[in-house]
Amino acid sequence: PADPARRLWEILWPVEGGRVLASALHTAENMLVPACLAVYLAKAGGRSAALEQYGVLKGMALPLLTFPFGLLGSLSVLLMPEITQAHILGQTERLKTLLDRMLRLTGYFSALAGVMFWVWGRPLAQLLYQSADAGFYLETLAPAMPLMYLESMVDGAMKGVGEQKAAFRYSVWDSILRIGGVVALLPRFGMKGFLAVILLSSLYTCAANTGHLLFSSGTQHAFRRWLGAPALAAVLAAAAGMALRKLLADGFAARLPLQLAALGIGGCATTGVFLLAAWPLGLGEEAAALWAAHRPGRPKK
């Protein structure tokens, strides 16, 4: 570029500025949530009860929900450099193909994770924490996992194609809307209001970031491929998983080894049903394409 320092500054300030501002806004949110929740729980324990409920969500449920995203990071490591390279070289069609693959694979992975937590979240929380509240949070937020995971992947892709200013803008608006939602909903509805804030926040950021990425890259939307097919596989897996959960109910009431066995059998069976349903719907095609592009021994371009 003609002015590399200016170009570097245009990249750095939205990214680093976004992190600093997001950190400040998240701190404000974390301070407001217990205070607003204490208003709702004024006659049921006040601030101590508010901190307990908020701690269950933040310290128990959310770490479990975000754990599978670490596995999805492998996909990011494979695709993000290629997305950035295609953008820099002006390879428009290749960029569209890579974005489509990223969105499609993320949809399948996040749908599977959502099904697992929706079906097995309560038994898992009971096994790990002996907490019914944590299980309720896992079950409630599980359907939003595709939005949460897509949001994170799309945010990285936007920065890879030079749209970090837009990502920064949407992040700021999201934080402001979250704070407004906390102040408006928590004093009236308690933790259910905060769960609604999380769900609406995920919907807004996912829609805003994905829409901007598709528009800026010229990629045609294919929501039936990205969300429709994964949702169909998820419904079939959820139906099988719920039936199996009823059959294994005695195992979850037994000693720890039997609980672990029941959870392992149920999780593996649910995963198997999902993969069997998703493979002919497009997962097999994308997995084969990803393997062909990154198989060991493949000559690099």
Identify the function of each model-found stretch:
Residues 1-22, 90-93, 215-231, 292:
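Interhelical loop/hinge segments that connect adjacent transmembrane helices in multipass membrane
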Residues 1-4, 8, 98-118, 124, ...:
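Short alpha-helical transmembrane segments in multi-pass integral membrane proteins
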Residues 14, 49-72, 104-105:
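Alpha-helical transmembrane segments of polytopic membrane transporters and translocases
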Residues 66-90, 96:
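Helix-loop junctions and terminal segments of transmembrane helices
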Residues 118-148, 152, 253-257:
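Interfacial segments at transmembrane-helix termini and the short loops linking adjacent helices
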Residues 136-162, 166-186, 191-213, 270:
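Short runs within selected transmembrane alpha-helices of multi-pass transporters and secretion channels
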Residues 182-183, 235-251:
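Hydrophobic alpha-helical transmembrane segments in multi-pass integral membrane proteins
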